[in-house]
């Protein structure tokens, strides 16, 4: 009886371990796919209409739209790509921010002083950013904060700090996944 019980326990243990390993490989493949597509998107965002990376992504079902906005401080360039995950049925959205490409961007990079950070609306974030960063509150790179504020104003939230565009879709669609990525200044914005 002990041998049968031991055999059943071993079968359960090894069967569960094999199933867990299979799931782990699937997750690893999915992570590798996300990483490869994110890297391709980081390259493609520099020449969105002509890039071979975006052509490759489009050939695999990705819909990609480039965006550019400019205000007095920042020129914001990014793309929004969307696709449906074949094996999980989840809606995937990827926002890719372009990196440093001009003097204005370098000006943003070189604003290295800290600024206070926090809040849940644009107004709160702007008010907190005007505080002294030495108040023992979270602080971020001033230039990156300026860039992210520009992105938020131009494409993420409306005047009432409600999500709009793709961010609204992600917020309202429970079975969706948002990937934020970028290179250089774009990587800072994505973070």
What kind of feature is each model-predicted range?
Residues 16-20:
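Sec/Tat signal peptide C-region and signal peptidase I cleavage site
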Residues 4-13:
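Sec-dependent N-terminal signal peptides
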Residues 107, 190-191:
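A short secondary-structure junction signal
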Residues 21-88:
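N-terminal low-complexity, Ser/Thr- and acidic-residue-enriched intrinsically disordered segments
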Residues 11, 36, 40-45, 133, ...:
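Short intrinsically disordered, low-complexity segments
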Residues 182-186, 190:
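Gly/Ala-rich beta-loop-alpha elbow adjacent to hydrolase catalytic centers
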Residues 61-181:
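A conserved cap/lid and substrate-binding interface adjacent to the catalytic center
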